[in-house]
């Protein structure tokens, strides 16, 4: 009987250790350059998510157990009717509790959300238009958060915090606004409301993948200084863009707010081959001696349609990890990546 118990414990303890480390252990410094891989889910229109989309996200989790989700969850799921709300919430919590996922925040300027937060709803400008002048979006979806004042942004962030607290979603650490729109006012406000990480810097070029409409380029806050080769960086008080120096915007832990560039853009913009090539570009950066990161991103409502694409890319990354080839590649959440970036060398 005793040998049987020992054998059983030998099987259970490693699993317990893995789960404990995913959820509790602080990141450890890496001796050599690493390519970090983040996998972000964007909840844009949670009411439109289908059972098939949810199954696709569950399959990506199951087929790629090393992968770590950063769910950019959307509190609008609680301000208007969302058929799969309970199932979606259960999924993000389960991946957090059992697969080391992170639950962050993604905000689009929908009327129901703004009304609930006590913010006046506006319909202009739109980031999906040919020009800014005269542009509008009556749903608010394409209206950039940067259209609103710091005080109004603060109300939205506080309302989000209350929803997350009530639903057991925890204190969010990573933030990304709809269409990645960003400004210094926004970065200062997310830092003041407990966020440590921004996942918004977006490549404007078409070297790999498509690009947004002309009005987005005028309104988003990003320019050609952000590329598919961009690496995570501390956010300066002088600019949201890379390449600027201290003083930095500090989070409430008195450490700098860090930006995680969206190197692989988002699902509909890029092919599987695009993402693989960008991954290989970052392998080359690490071989030259610099730790770097890529970000893969998928919308909740197109998860089923994009499953094969991301399964293929994640399998490609998994194969590199399993091969033991250098440089080392590690999956990580965006907030944990920020902690790694700030570790002393």
Each language-model region and where it sits:
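Well-ordered, non-membrane alpha-helical segments in soluble/globular domains
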Residues: 49-58, 83-91, 153-158, 273-283, ...
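Metal-dependent polysaccharide deacetylase catalytic core of the NodB/CE4 family, i.e.
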Residues: 73-183, 203-210, 264, 295-300
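Active-site-adjacent pocket scaffolds in enzyme catalytic domains
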Residues: 174-290
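Bacterial N-terminal signal peptides
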Residues: 11-23
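C-terminal domain-boundary segment and adjacent tail
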Residues: 32, 98, 197, 202, ...
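Structural recognition of the beta-strand scaffold that forms the well-ordered cores
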Residues: 37-40, 69-72, 103-105, 173-176, ...
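Active-site beta->alpha N-cap acidic-glycine motif
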Residues: 30-102, 166, 171-173, 320
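Bacterial N-terminal signal peptides that target proteins for export
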Residues: 1-14
